[in-house]
């Protein structure tokens, strides 16, 4: 049974009602959380994934065996998630990508949750990297060297998927999320 936060669902619905536009609602929520730190942001990201329809869990801080910030399950397989709050960095950098690789390696090595090498390792950040960022090249280099996919989702894209789930009143997930490599655009 998926846990969906009624308070966040109501916040999304109210934002849509107020603006009558998904884009304006996304902009308002993006701005609202622009200074959020990990204590607020990480849980919010997990709850957005739950609204979209995923079994997603926040890792317990300080647990060495749970390196990833959150774990999402698709078809019984674990997808590690590295989360970067806007308080940590406004635009995703190579640090988050390296941590996503580390999350995947540790998950594969320790077998804490069922997964496989072909499933992506995610990074969720406030803003996606610009097109000239080293992030894009690093994602390709990681795939070339290790055949590990790193997927990147920005806060605006995640909000768009969650708003769509709330407006349409159905859960459809994110198409091919488990195979995402590079930056997702809603």
Positions of predicted regions on the chain:
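Catalytic core segments in nucleotide and nucleic-acid processing enzymes
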Residues: 22-186
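Charged, low-complexity intrinsically disordered tails and linkers
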Residues: 1-19
